[in-house]
């Protein structure tokens, strides 16, 4: 099986701190006949190594992390209901349109403004992360990868939980932008803490 793997787990020094995060359990899969394809969305997106750490920062109105993918390709973990400001009259926005009428027209804009990937200095790195996610997804698909083992908790690669955007070490349910893109494209995603026993025998 061809497996896309976060390059830092394979020993490549591409993390934000300029180091690697080698995982022997992941590396041993190659000895069991699996072909490991290294990926690093941050580097593919043009970010330097080392770099200022980043986290996904969400607006208060962010929706469910399990919401379906948006039509414009926004990863499903980032889709949300639009934020609407009330004019005090039930069912209407401040512009006089009903909530139901304004929902569809504002949904796409909400997807764009309800989240961002910021570094610890406040700089917006969303474009680089999105660019890298799509580049590595394309490479994984071209290689025929059926599975991705991606670094836990990362704003690119986390699957199931990520840091909450406060740079305090707090975790919240969610997906990294690349992990969500892989998942939405039909590539199964796990992290390095998963049980590889069954996979090792495949």
Regions found by a protein language model. Give the residues of each.
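Short, well-ordered beta-to-alpha junction loops that form the rim of enzyme active sites
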Residues: 8, 151-154, 194
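Short, surface-exposed acidic-centric catalytic microdomains
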Residues: 21-79, 101-118
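Divalent-metal-activated hydrolytic enzyme cores
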Residues: 32, 42-44, 72, 115-139, ...
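Short hydrophobic alpha-helical segments enriched in small aliphatic residues
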Residues: 72-73, 84, 88, 96
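Internal, conserved structured core segments that host functional sites
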Residues: 145-162, 166
